[in-house]
Regions:
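Short, flexible/disordered intra-domain loops and linkers
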Residues: 41-42, 75, 133, 165-166, ...
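Conserved C-terminal portion of the radical SAM core fold
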Residues: 140-197, 204-226
Length: 231
């Protein structure tokens, strides 16, 4: 599995895929990333350190993802991320977190004092019924502005039966209204019961994507490995 890469288009940054103890919300119907986990924090740190040692700081910006939330990374890994940022001139670091951990974000910012911490939330869609009844995301808030209040960036998931051009456009517009940047992920076949809908994907690619392909605030991942990490 590739765990280090560089994103050179749009917001240039290095990216690392680290390993935590396991996603606290493994019930999302569309996701099997939570299989990338280990209960042994010492083993996790050893792996994560080897990945972080590849970071150069050349862009001054680092995105850190794991198969869950940043709060599932061990304390040694978090401290090492901070050290790497300080030592290699990284002034901006991006982390991902589930909505349920939003109240822990201020403490994380304090821990990374002097570094601009950007928090990304996996929203998937602002359609409450679709998100909770179909995707089983576990976000009990329906108001977009409240969901986004503690976050600067958001992940959205398109290409599933039941989504329409109107629903996808609404998600993008609301995401750009309440967040600094968004990342659109196209559903890829995996081990879950949620499968890609080629008609919905074609609608996005042909009718929506051209409007945002060059938008510096919008990342678009047709494949889940387009950032160069994962497998």
């Amino acid at each position: 599995m590739d765990r280090y890469s560089k994103i050179v288009e749009k917001q240039a940054r290095e990216i690392v895929l680290l390993r935590g103890t396991g996603c606290a919300c493994p019930s999302c119907a569309f996701c099997d990333y939570h299989d990338d986990k280990c209960a042994d924090e010492t083993a996790n740190f050893q792996l994560n350190k080897s990945v972080l040692d590849a970071v150069t700081g050349e862009f001054g910006e680092l995105e850190v993802i794991n198969s869950g939330s940043v709060f599932e990374l061990d304390s040694q890994t978090l401290a090492y991320i901070r050290d790497v940022c300080y030592q290699r001139g990284i002034s901006v670091v991006h982390f991902e977190s589930h909505y349920i951990f939003r109240e822990r974000i201020p403490a994380l910012r304090s821990f990374f004092e002097g570094i601009d911490v950007k928090m990304k939330i996996g929203i998937e869609t602002f359609d409450f019924e679709f998100r909770e009844q179909v995707l089983n995301k576990g976000i009990d808030e329906s108001a977009p502005e409240l969901i986004c209040a503690a976050f600067q960036e958001g992940n959205f998931l398109f290409g599933i039966s039941g989504q329409t051009r109107a629903s996808m456009e609404r998600d993008i517009q609301l995401g750009l209204r309440y967040l600094e940047r968004i990342c659109i992920n196209i559903m890829c076949k995996n081990t879950t019961s949620i499968t890609p809908d080629e008609k919905v994907i074609r609608c996005f690619v042909e009718e929506i994507m051209p409007q945002y392909a060059d938008d510096q605030r919008v990342d678009i991942l047709i494949s889940n490995t387009d950032f160069g990490v994962g497998d």
